[in-house]
Structure formats: C-alpha cells, structure tokens
Amino acid sequence: MSGGAVAFLLLVAAAAVANAAVTYDHRSLTINGQRRILISGSIHYPRSTPEMWPDLIQKAKDGGLDVIQTYVFWNGHEPVQGQYYFSDRYDLVRFVKLVKQAGLYVNLRIGPYVCAEWNYGGFPVWLKYVPGISFRTDNGPFKAAMQTFVEKIVSMMKSEGLFEWQGGPIILAQVENEYGPMESVMGSGAKSYVDWAAKMAVATNAGVPWIMCKQDDAPDPVINTCNGFYCDDFTPNSKNKPSMWTEAWSGWFTAFGGTVPQRPVEDLAFAVARFIQKGGSFINYYMYHGGTNFDRTAGGPFIATSYDYDAPIDEYGLLRQPKWGHLTNLHKAIKQAETALVAGDPTVQNIGNYEKAYVFRSSSGDCAAFLSNFHTSAAARVAFNGRRYDLPAWSISVLPDCRTAVYNTATVTAASSPAKMNPAGGFTWQSYGEATNSLDETAFTKDGLVEQLSMTWDKSDYLWYTTYVNIDSGEQFLKSGQWPQLTVYSAGHSVQVFVNGQYFGNAYGGYDGPKLTYSGYVKMWQGSNKISILSSAVGLPNVGTHYETWNIGVLGPVTLSGLNEGKRDLSKQKWTYQIGLKGEKLGVHSVSGSSSVEWGGAAGKQPVTWHRAYFNAPAGGAPVALDLGSMGKGQAWVNGHLIGRYWSYKASGNCGGCSYAGTYSEKKCQANCGDASQRWYHVPRSWLNPSGNLVVLLEEFGGDLSGVTLMTRTT
C-alpha cells in the first residue's frame, strides 16, 4: 500500500472518530454530530442476574429508552485489596456489551462512591483500615485508592473498546456522587477534593464527557447534574453545559420497619415533562429496574432486600403496568418533538393563572409545544395557537407539531396489570441448632468491649461478645428470686442475649436510629455465669461523612443491676470474641456443606437455628419467590446462593389516600402499614434446578416454618 493511501486511510479514521465524539453545548449532548434528547434508565447489574440482563435491557429499549445507566460497585469488584472480581453478577464488561448489542448507550457512574442504599456506599470495608485514611476529602491515602480504582475501570473499558469513540456504547462517565450537600461539613479539604476528583477523571482520557451529580461547583469541563423528584428548576453552573437529570426518582426504597413507597405514574410523567419543557435534554429514571439486594449488599443500615423502587420494571423483571406503558407513551411524544426541542431554548407564554405554554421552534420550521397546568385540583381549558385544549390538574400536554395533543401526563391509557403472588408449594423442614454457648479455636479475648466491624471486616453479619460474671453465695437475689437486670447499649444493629445458654430476648434499632438498648432480667446462679451476646449487622451505612469513624456493635456500657453492690459495670472486664456463626464456617447453607452436620426434625420457634428443605422448581417460566412472612429475622439461601437478609419487621407509617396531584415526597403515598415491610424474596430462575433444590434459612429470632411457601409471580 502506498504512503498516500495509508495517509488517506488515517485521515478517514480520524474523521470517523471526530464525528463519533460525544460533545455538548448548552442545549444537549451531541452524538455523531447531532444534538439529542436522551431518555435513560438505571439498571444495576449486580441487582439482577446475567440471565436476566438481556430481557431487562430489551424491555428498557421497548420502553423508549436510549441509555442504560449504572453505578460501578467498588466493594463488589475489589472485596480484598488488590484482588479483583468481574464475574457472574459483577461481570461489568458483559453487561455493557449486552447494552451495546441492544443498540443503546451507557452512562457509567464510576464514582466510586455510589450511595445507592448499597452496603457501605460501595466502598470496600478494607479501605477503612488503610493507615491515615479519611474518606471523600483531600486525603492522600483515600485519593490514591480512589484513583487506582477509577483508572482501572476506565482502562478496562478502553481495552474492551467500549467508549463511544471506539464504537462502544459508553457516552458518559461519572466521578464522585452527590458530594455537594456534604461539602459544608467536610471542611477546608472539600473543595480541593472536588477539583482533584474532576481533574483526575478528565486525565484518564476516557474520551467522553464526565459528570458530577448534585455538585454545583463542578469545575469545567465536568457537567454538574441534578438528582431529585423534580428537577425543572435546576440550572447548570455554566451557560455552556446542558441541563441533565441523572436521577429522576421513580419511587423510593424500602427499609425494614418502613412502608413501601409508591409514586403515581401521572406525577412521574408530569415531572419529566416539566424538565423537558424547561430545556432539559437528558433524563434518567432511578430506578428503571431496581432489582434485589442479593447477598449482604443492602446498606442503610436496615435497607430491605427488595430494591423494587416502584420502578417501571419490577424487582422480578416484569412490567409494572400502567407505569411502564404510560412512560413509554411519554417517550414517544418527546421523540416526535425532538427536532424542535434541540433547536434552541423555549419561549414561554402565559395562557392562564396556573397554565403556561413552552414553545420550541427550529430554523427549518419545526414547532413543538408543552401546555402545562400546575393547579393541584382544578382542570383548565386553555387557548393556544388558535385552538382550545383541556388540561387536567397537575398535568402537561405534549404537542409535537404545536397543534395536536398526542399525550397528557395525567391521562393514562396504558392498561393496568397488577402483579399476583401464587402459591407453588410448601416445604418439609429439618433443623440444626447453632451452638450459643460454645467457642472454637478462633475465639480471642481482649480487655473491654471492641467495635464490631474492626473485628469482622464485614465478612459476617455476626459477632459473639462473651464474658463471665461471678455470683457470690451471699447475693440477695439468690434467695428472693428477683433476678438481676442486664442492660446492653449497642451502636447497632441487633442483639440477642443468652445467659448460661438460656435465651433471654433481643433488641434492635431501626432505619431512623440504629442504636439500641437491651434491658431485661436474667436468671443467674451462684458461681460463674456466662453471658453471651450475639450482635448482628443489618447492612452498613451508605450515606454520610467520615466513613472512617463509623462503628457498630456492643460499645457499652454493659451493666448488671440488682446485686448487693448495686450496679456492676461489665464493660471493661475481659470479653471473648467469636467472629461469625458455627454454621457459617461449616457452610451448612451450601449444597456441599449441608451434609457436614446432623439435622434433626423441624424445630419450633427457637432462636439462632438453621433450617433446610428440598423442593422442585415450579413449572413454567414465571419468576419465583419465597414467602417468609411467618419468619422472624435472618438470612436465606437457595442452592448456596444468598438471596439476602429477611425480616418480618412490621411497617409503620401513614398509608392514607394517595392523589397524583401535588408535590410528591417519599412520605406521600405509602403501602404495607401494619404488615411486614417485605414478605416475598426473589429467587432467580437461573439459580434453580428442575428438582432437588436446597433452601436454607438461618432464623435468628424464632419463626413459624409452617407458613413458609414457594411462590410464583405473574401479571
């Protein structure tokens, strides 16, 4: 090949890359030289299985989405420092390639802080114990670890050819996450940290725009974006940046002990149309499919295993109707108006006391209008462009040609199809009692009480605190029968108390306050008495400041009252610690480890007990769940897969009526008051065999096995 031919080919290649570059101006992102209105939806790859991904992505595409948005979960990818994991549910490359195959784009939110109601906000716990570390500030050890991970992800995406300029689907990347509200409390290092993070991200040469959400001072060229229930009042920090909404909350998360929030689709559609009519050009539904907090990935603490989020695609991968259908129709209407929308900024006309018209025109004559009625109860008839239009309360009509109203946010024409849970069989149980008063060779003794996470490193939810109390023969309670009172103060999240192997009760915190106090009378005898406290975590916090200072477990004081001496403080005496449960170490929840212990008949409502049963997969292809509403608190496995924590914690809240009209918040439309926050637990079909499936429950409090049922979900 001649030198001239080579030069020509290089020029063609360079031109192709330049043409494919993702850029932006004040109006929108530009892809392949064209301004775009982009509709996006969050699907987090670890919250579903690889077998579910193609169907979820296709349903998103069918729903009118252009982009799939996902966080990158650091603690899933680097659970041990320097040891990386990118397989199974954490196969990020596979997920991104599936999005490409579907013809959609990707917004990759690398963070690496994610929040997301995810354990420890996505940070690996080992990071807390890096010497000298201070999280999310101008701190050398933290910045070094963060940069290593961000650069690794960018390098991996480049090597796989996954950025848009390489022919891949990634058009955006995000660094940090919702840091703006934290700056004022993070002190002088906050602003320099933000500037460093932005500069570090841009220096990776990812070749796509970087964003920071809820970051009003994001430095150029990083785009600051909005998160919230509504973002139509949001303005970027530069006239050269487009208005982007990275989290349009489609619902809200559920916490154990909390209600199930639901967001009416009429209001969600209204919020999106409000944003578009005010000049917004990128909107992402958080979540479009929420999925499941499998394993122990739920954060909070006290975040439920279900991350359904009232999303258009439900936790099980089924369409939530009419939400999915009504939003799909909205997206079609917006796309019909796209040419006019991207041409420039709207002009605004007052067409009533509460009504306005936002009109977009292109130089070629295209015209689109959004007619809005902000009254929360009264419909309106308005005049626009020589015609009259009826606008329901709290609604927007979309006119892609400035004449024909093809869509109204409050007029739902999509068919409703409520989901049903169908019984598919019961279980025959066997039980194995966890040893509550024995320690093995891994136990260790220290003076005083020690913080839980510093010992478990989150390898287990559980830590035994054990100490001994000597009771003299002269103690008055031995004669009176008025037993002493044990009081335990804990930073969270749940404790169970045993004395001499006998169970005396439990105490636990809640989402609004993880700290707890146990206080109860305990039976003791003359001589040495063994006090065993099982402390359990219910997810690590996912939002806040100074992660390096957070703690859980029994921090004290622990006191014993009602003795001749009055109150005895046990906090500073010797305590013996045992990380995890015996059954965990033996792997009784796994298919191979289940045979390592001797199982007996089904036990009654006993605390800290393992239960197992075998079952056949239900016929057909409908999603599968376990009904654990009759159980107490614990963890559940199927064929060795931890489907998550379960807890029949009764929901408290206000489950009154719900109108779509008026400003929405997560407290407005609630369900499940008085019932368990979560009753059904998703069991992915890909985890099942046709027959001989093993289900194992670790029950902490003592539940009713007779109520546990296999279910299928249909619409």
Swiss-Prot record:
Keywords assigned by UniProt, alphabetized: Apoplast, Glycosidase, Hydrolase, Secreted, Signal
Question: Any idea which GO molecular function terms this record carries?
Answer: beta-galactosidase activity
Gene3D superfamilies the UniProt entry points to:
Galactose-binding domain-like, Glycosidases
The protein depicted here goes by the name Beta-galactosidase 9
Instruction: Respond yes or no to whether keyword Hydrolase is given for this record.
Output: yes
The similarity annotation says:
Belongs to the glycosyl hydrolase 35 family.
At the top level of its lineage, which domain of life is listed? Eukaryota
- A GO CC term attached to the entry: plant-type cell wall
Q: Does the keyword Signal apply?
A: yes
Q: Which Pfam families match?
A: BetaGal_gal-bd, GHD, Glyco_hydro_35
What lineage is this protein's organism placed in?
Eukaryota, Viridiplantae, Streptophyta, Embryophyta, Tracheophyta
Q: Which residues form the signal peptide?
A: 1-20
Annotated active site residues, numbered on this chain, are: 178, 247
